[in-house]
Amino acid sequence: MIDAKSEHKIAPWKIEEVNALKELLKSTSIIALIDMMEVPAVQLQEIRDKIRDQMTLKMSRNTLMKRAIEEVAEETGNPEFAKLADYLDKGAAIIATEMNPFKLFKTLDESKSPAPVKGGATAPCDIEVKAGSTGMPPGPFLSELKAVGIPAAIDKGKIGIKEDKVVVKEGEVVSQKLAVVLSALGIKPVTVGLNVLGVYEDGVIYTESDLKIDEEEFIGKIQKAYTSAFNLSVNAVIPTSATIETIVQKAFNDAKAVSVESAFVTDKTADAILGKAYAQMIAVAGLAGDDALDEELIEKMSSGAAAPVEEAPVEEKKEEKKEEAAPAAGLGMLF
């Protein structure tokens, strides 16, 4: 906190700003630091409009944000929160929200938009100008195109580009003249938006590399892990709330199969045992001659009235598939 001895040395507006930042930092459970250094004013306003209802964005001086973070950490007895100040960089700003870090990152990433490249900037990729009409009438722009190495000529009363041309390769510096031409052609090779520096949640600070994940791959891994754990629980007979029903069903089916195979009669297996014995009798009778059989058995064999063998149903796989779908149910909440 700013003490009384030093207050007279600090501009009142700075004290008010730090206090306002502290209120913001205490207002939500999720606090993010974002970099908005390279975001033009027009794009920044568009982004603000997109995220206004989901989070609060506040810009300030890095020194004041650092002080506010450290004071909140001290006042709340939370030294882990103070580490968030280590992520202050460039043109940082604070976002306060209740949105979980992964969903916050996705929302900010989706709010990014294409923008023209600035002169003196490094090309983020190979920048190519496509052949075709520019839609512009003959004039000075024709000379500007040629000056930056773009083959152009008048075609049907309009300035046209003769062929596809890579005007700057990834990693090269874009000249001011080329930047002006690309902007005039409506080419926007740069993606601008709010980049995450660090997100604090419940004692943990996430960086962009932590939050930038392939959702389908991530969910697939969780589903695979769940399936493996489910099968291990069933096969090792380690009951859980998710597997107890399948374990009991598997045990019942295994016991029933043993009972039938060993001819150990129970009220659950009597029919299956008798059916199996009957089928075996008919099979043996079929190998014997008619002289060895009585008339009733011969009649049954000729009519094909052999009783079907009842087999113990195997249901655990069906149940496994039913259970496997469960882990995906709540994963959407992360994103």
UniProtKB/Swiss-Prot annotation:
One of its GO terms (cellular component) is cytosolic large ribosomal subunit. Residues 304-335 are annotated as: Disordered. Pfam families: Ribosomal_L10, RL10P_insert. GO terms for molecular function: large ribosomal subunit rRNA binding; structural constituent of ribosome. Keywords: Ribonucleoprotein, Ribosomal protein, RNA-binding, rRNA-binding. It comes from the Archaea. CDD domains: Ribosomal_P0_L10e. Residues 314-325 have a biased composition (Basic and acidic residues). GO terms for biological process: cytoplasmic translation; ribosomal large subunit assembly. PANTHER family: 60S ACIDIC RIBOSOMAL PROTEIN P0 (PTHR45699), LARGE RIBOSOMAL SUBUNIT PROTEIN UL10 (PTHR45699:SF3). Part of the 50S ribosomal subunit. Forms part of the ribosomal stalk which helps the ribosome interact with GTP-bound translation factors. Forms a heptameric L10(L12)2(L12)2(L12)2 complex, where L10 forms an elongated spine to which the L12 dimers bind in a sequential fashion. NCBIfam families: PRK04019.1-2 (NF003096), PRK04019.1-5 (NF003098). HAMAP family: Ribosomal_uL10_arch. Forms part of the ribosomal stalk, playing a central role in the interaction of the ribosome with GTP-bound translation factors. Belongs to the universal ribosomal protein uL10 family. This is Large ribosomal subunit protein uL10.
